[in-house]
């Protein structure tokens, strides 16, 4: 029978893995969040930048940074990316901070959807690490990652659909413009030929 501590760890894992968030990023700003970790804890975060403007066809990007308990200590950095997944193994106990940045653009509709897949304590001295409980935790994490990835795919599909619709609109209006040019050119040629023959007949 699993010990109370093991059950508690599993419960914590399931709780954190269910945490899904969507936040609006301020123009030329950032949004930051905190996690209290013990040494050996693993913090896994996946994210997808998006646009709350339903008509947008641009794939927006941003930056992601994880800081240690000391604000100047940068542990993980990802620059100019549309999505990603970062895993950090806490080197020591402390108050860790992670931030999503929009500091290089004035876009006011940029948002980020992110999921915390789990804060899992790994006891390297536990001989039962590879037990059924461990397998259940891993399976739960993988299941959550698949579900989160599906939510990100929805965001990407919306962006790609808007891009396709925007391209179709441009092609449609360009075709109408070309048709108008052809009709105008044909009318001009008819008018010119009629005038030409009228002048010729008068001569």
Curated annotation (Swiss-Prot):
Transmembrane helix recorded as keyword: yes
Q: How does it sit in the membrane?
A: Single-pass type I membrane protein
Q: Which UniProt keywords apply?
A: Endoplasmic reticulum, ER-Golgi transport, Golgi apparatus, Membrane, Protein transport, Signal, Transmembrane, Transmembrane helix, Transport
All residue ranges annotated as the GOLD domain in the record: 30-118
Q: Where in the cell is it found?
A: Endoplasmic reticulum membrane; Golgi apparatus membrane
Q: Name one GO cellular component term.
A: COPII-coated ER to Golgi transport vesicle
Chain segments annotated as transmembrane: 173-193
* Entry keyword Nucleotide-binding: no
Give the main location: endoplasmic reticulum
Matching PROSITE patterns: GOLD (PS50866)
The UniProt record's further free-text remark is: Present with 26800 molecules/cell in log phase SD medium.
- The molecule here is called Endosomal protein P24B
| Organism name | Saccharomyces cerevisiae (strain ATCC 204508 / S288c) (Baker's yeast)
Q: What gene does the UniProt entry assign to this protein?
A: EMP24
């Amino acid at each position: 029978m699993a010990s109370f501590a093991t059950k508690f760890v599993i419960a914590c894992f399931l709780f954190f893995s269910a945490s899904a968030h969507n936040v609006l990023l301020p123009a030329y700003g950032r949004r930051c969040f905190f996690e209290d970790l013990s040494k050996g804890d693993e913090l896994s975060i996946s994210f997808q930048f998006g646009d709350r403007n339903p008509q947008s066809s641009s794939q927006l990007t941003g930056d992601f940074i994880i800081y240690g308990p000391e604000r100047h200590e940068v542990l993980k950095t990802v620059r100019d990316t549309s999505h990603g997944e970062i895993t950090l193994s806490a080197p020591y106990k402390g108050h860790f901070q992670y931030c999503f940045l929009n500091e290089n653009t004035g876009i006011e509709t940029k948002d980020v959807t992110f999921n915390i897949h789990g804060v899992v304590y790994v006891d390297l001295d536990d001989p039962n690490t590879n037990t059924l409980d461990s397998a259940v935790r891993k399976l739960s994490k993988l299941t959550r990652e698949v579900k989160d990835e599906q939510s990100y795919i929805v965001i990407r599909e919306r962006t790609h659909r808007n891009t396709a619709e925007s391209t179709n609109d441009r092609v449609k209006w360009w075709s109408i413009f070309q048709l108008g040019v052809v009709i105008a050119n044909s009318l001009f040629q008819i008018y010119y030929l009629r005038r030409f023959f009228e002048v010729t007949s008068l001569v």
